[in-house]
Amino acid sequence: GDFNCWNQTDHPLTHIGDGVWELYLEGENALWDGCKVKTVVDSNLIRTEHIPLYIRRAVQDSRTNIFCGEVVDERSTFRWTDANFVATDDIFIYEAHIGMCLEEGRIASYREFADQILPHIKDSGYTTIQLMAIMEHPYYGSFGYQVSNFYAASSRFGTPDDLKYLVNKAHEMGLAVLLDLVHSHAVKNTADGINLFDGTT
């Protein structure tokens, strides 16, 4: 990754059992917010690059269209203000796709959805929103049903803090939030998915 100028052999991981591998990097700033990273898997079959399985953010290079893992500083300064939110027992669900919520014919953002669409949903009497396509997925046309990174919110709609902003605002308006995640539709891609991550199909 960025931390070692993308040298694939400088930082080998150590196998600690049960399919778990680890790497210890010295220094508080060995990895930083926005640092791009990948994992190289050298198996009997082939050497492949992958986005780390537990990455919290994956971003797409605008020139190559290739996805890469990006380190997220977990010490986010986002300030939640929804402590008093209590979900209602009267569930009335509005299903929505963040990217397709605007009329302009472009991909919308988490913040645009929060500021422009949530008031309409609330005014229409809904109590819950169900968001499609939240987990990272390389093929936009899949509506998020070809997930590549199960722990990363889709970066094409904004940052993790932008998604927190949306959820926080929904809760402030009394709306519960459900994330539509389908585990049975993982993408078959190797570079940005979980296929061949352990060296097998």
What does each model-identified segment do?
Residues 1-3:
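Extended low-complexity, serine/threonine- and proline-enriched intrinsically disordered segments
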Residues 59, 81-88, 97-201:
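Substrate-binding/active-site clefts of carbohydrate-active enzymes
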